[in-house]
């Protein structure tokens, strides 16, 4: 729903398609309008078969589990926001370029390995964004939330006092992959509430 709210702003006029595997367009429109974190969104939202219309801006909406099956070309998509958390390895990301011909893929989690012919660049703004070269980096990621919190502090401490070695402990907020109460999961640690 965050992508859809961005699509209705003047900044992101190019957004044309959402592929959400978790639910249909009616559920997405409802979650967009009634957001538990940001409150009620005061935009006109309408749902038609495979579209969400926000303030007259039409967004194609599909729910394909395999992104290679999504009709991206119908919506003239050339930049993908990969936010499933499932496609974070080169073998899952390279088909965006090799099979679908995407210009750019922006991944919402850290990525390791060679993608689209280059080592993945995990950017932490204010730390290493100068390494980004648009002529060679087709895949971009903003690293992890923990890295984004830690890197600026480590940079300042290291530049002023020199860090020889260190260890961190992080207390992370609840995520969508965790359960509020104990439940059966293949990862027994994450099965605990």
Where do the language-model regions lie?
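A structured beta-alpha segment of the ubiquitous adenosine-cofactor-binding alpha/beta core
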Residues: 38-91, 134
């Amino acid at each position: 729903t965050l992508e859809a709210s961005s699509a209705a702003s003047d900044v992101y006029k190019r957004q044309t398609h959402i592929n959400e595997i978790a639910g249909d367009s009616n559920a997405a429109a409802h979650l967009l309008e009634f957001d538990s974190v940001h409150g009620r969104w005061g935009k006109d939202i309408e749902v038609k078969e495979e579209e969400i219309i926000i303030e007259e801006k039409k967004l194609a909406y599909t729910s394909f589990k395999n992104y290679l099956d999504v009709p991206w070309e119908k919506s003239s998509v050339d930049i993908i926001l990969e936010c499933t958390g499932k496609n974070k390895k080169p073998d899952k990301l390279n088909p965006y370029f090799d099979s679908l011909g995407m210009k750019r893929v922006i991944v919402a989690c850290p990525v390791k390995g060679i993608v689209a012919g280059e080592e993945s660049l995990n950017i932490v703004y204010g730390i290493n964004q100068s390494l980004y070269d648009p002529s060679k980096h087709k895949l971009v990621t903003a690293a992890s939330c923990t890295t984004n919190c830690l890197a600026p502090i480590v940079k300042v401490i290291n530049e002023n006092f020199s860090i020889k070695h260190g260890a961190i402990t992080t207390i992370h907020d609840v995520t969508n992959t965790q359960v509020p109460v104990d439940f059966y999961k293949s990862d027994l640690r994450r099965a605990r509430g």
